Amino acid sequence: METNVNPLAVILVYFDSKGDRLLYRYPYQTLGQTEVANDEQRKSRKRNPYAVANTDDLLQTPTHLGAAKSQGQLQGFADEVLSALFAVKPQLCNQKFELKLNDVRFVSHPTLIPQKEQRSGPMAKQQMLINIVFALHAQASYSIVKCYHELSKRLGLALKFEEQRSGYLTEQTAQMARTHDEQQQQPLERTLELIAERCSLAQALRSIFHDLCTTGLLSTSLNHNLTLCFCLPAKAHQLHKKGSMVDPETIDRCLRALKPYHGMLLLVDFAELLDCVPPTGARMLWQLVDVYDPLISLQSMSSNADLSIEHVYKLVSHLVYWAKATIIYPLCETNVYVIAPDAPLHTKSHLVEKFSARFAGMSLFEVISDFSLPTSIGHLTTPLQQPARQGILAQMVIWMLQHHLLMQLHTYVQFMPSEDEFGDSASCSNHLRDAISDEEGDQEPDADELHGSMLSMSSHPLPVPAVLVGGHRREASEDHSSLASDNIAVQPSSSHKSNFSITASMSTDNCDSLDSMEDEQKLKELLQVFSDADRAAIRRIPASANVDDLSLLVKLYQMGYFKSEHHLEEIMYFENLRRSQLLQLLDKFRDVLIIYETEDPAIASMYNTK
């Protein structure tokens, strides 16, 4: 659930030689105040005489104590109790701390920080414990808990750095403790408000809490020196697709599948990109942004920006993690898109007005209706259209991709020969035999004509009938040879040149015969990679007699491209093939190859609603 992502509270606990103390918490509503008001309201109600008495086990802890209320605030815990719980022993410091009380889960990373050395006096360096605790719903997933622990760890390291640099933490904690002592007679809520006004650390914690509850993106400055950047993916990705719970593990799986032929699509304006990187990394990010184009691949952007492909991978991965960009295949005419099944296309969707404001005079429903069925961009454009019209269509497709209204379909290939090919071959053989017998009619062929291998029959597309010469019946082969010999005998051998031409043609026939024998041997070697059943199915395809076609088929088969795990764009990139060349091969061997279209599983998994 979305509510399980938001924190209930952020708590700052401090411990040194003087003891432990809860210095700050936010939200700072008085603990137990709401429970008292609710109890008084329940008592003031008129009791129903027919109400059933509560017979709950008295040994169980009442659920309202320490419960996370619907308002999303932590209530029912006293400051003294929380301070004693979170001021852990040194043995538990510098590691993950997790505690579950009723329906609240507390997550932190206690950090031991040595105090800055005093210049005067040989005093021994003292250590203090700082523990920034996040209160979460007990039902929060493991990935969410892991993210909050990482944030607590980073805050501890940042405060440790500032303490060693300028004594920042000692100054802030002393000011908080002094404010508590001065405001002992005041309500706790007023004391915490005054601390937030005086202490920059309290202001930073309050800002962190608000950012976690709204965008999930943090860019907080500590002591006006150190910038802390953090992203809560489960919250940040909901800004672009409401209801999508994206955890870091899913993003990592997607980014591990990143290839040079992929492209990048920014989801925000350029001005918002600097929020996700510290100032030291802004220069390299702008190098990539200057050459950004959704029409080119990451490899092309790497070359144009004069960056290595590894640096481009890291920058793109960072932008995807921070929900600033998404992975696509570069926009081109052959890309196939279809309406996303969970696209918010109801009549009152805010995207309708947003689309009309972006593209004046255009209707979102009218434009997106062209993608009701899987359609390529090339099918929606014609050569007669003006380039400006084609550019507007590309911009509209980009806009719909940014708002997750469209999804791209890729073509995958599965090698799957038919199981009844032998039966089909036998029926085809019987059909050919019946055709031969019907065509010859009541002619009585010799027994030798009805025998022969299937290969010899298939080599002759049409049966050659017997002919009558001089009232005697002869076989077609005999007649053919006799006619050939007669033709040679009739033609006068008037010159040596004619004899030489006959000899040359005979030598050419011999060379062709040798080439055909070599091709036949190579075909047999190529077919050895298949099983007997698959080999028989491939032999029935006419294209299997072509050495080049069969060689390419065997190569792609051995590389594992026909297991529904690689789409055509990936095959084209890694094997350096043209799309037309690959499509022709798939068409020639369509009897043993199944082709289907679906979205890329690695990219699609990021925005599956959970």
Swiss-Prot record:
Belongs to the NPR3 family. The keyword Nucleotide-binding does not apply. Component of the GATOR complex consisting of mio, Nup44A/Seh1, Im11, Nplr3, Nplr2, Wdr24, Wdr59 and Sec13. Within the GATOR complex, probable component of the GATOR1 subcomplex which is likely composed of Iml1, Nplr2 and Nplr3. Interacts with Nprl2. The gene is Nprl3. An essential component of the GATOR subcomplex GATOR1 which functions as an inhibitor of the amino acid-sensing branch of the TORC1 signaling pathway. The two GATOR subcomplexes, GATOR1 and GATOR2, regulate the TORC1 pathway in order to mediate metabolic homeostasis, female gametogenesis and the response to amino acid limitation and complete starvation. Disruption phenotype: A high percentage of mutants die as pupae or pharate adults. Under nutrient-replete conditions, larvae display a significant increase in TORC1 activity. Adult escapers display a small but significant increase in body weight and a reduction in climbing. Newly hatched males have a decreased tolerance to both complete starvation and amino acid starvation, likely due to decreased triacylglyceride (TAG) storage and the inability to down-regulate TORC1 activity and activate catabolic metabolism and autophagy. GO terms for biological process: cell division; cellular response to amino acid starvation; cellular response to starvation; germarium-derived egg chamber formation; meiotic cell cycle; negative regulation of cell size; negative regulation of TOR signaling; negative regulation of TORC1 signaling. The modification Phosphoserine is found at residue 437. Keywords: Cell cycle, Cell division, Cytoplasm, Lysosome, Meiosis, Mitosis, Phosphoprotein. The lineage of its organism: Eukaryota, Metazoa, Ecdysozoa, Arthropoda, Hexapoda. GO terms for cellular component: autolysosome; cytoplasm; GATOR1 complex; GATOR2 complex; lysosome; nucleus; Seh1-associated complex. InterPro entries: HTH_NPRL3, Npr3. Residues 482-501 have a biased composition (Polar residues). This is GATOR complex protein NPRL3. It comes from the Eukaryota. PANTHER family: CGTHBA PROTEIN -14 GENE PROTEIN, GATOR COMPLEX PROTEIN NPRL3. It is found in: Cytoplasm; Lysosome. Residues 474-501 are annotated as: Disordered.
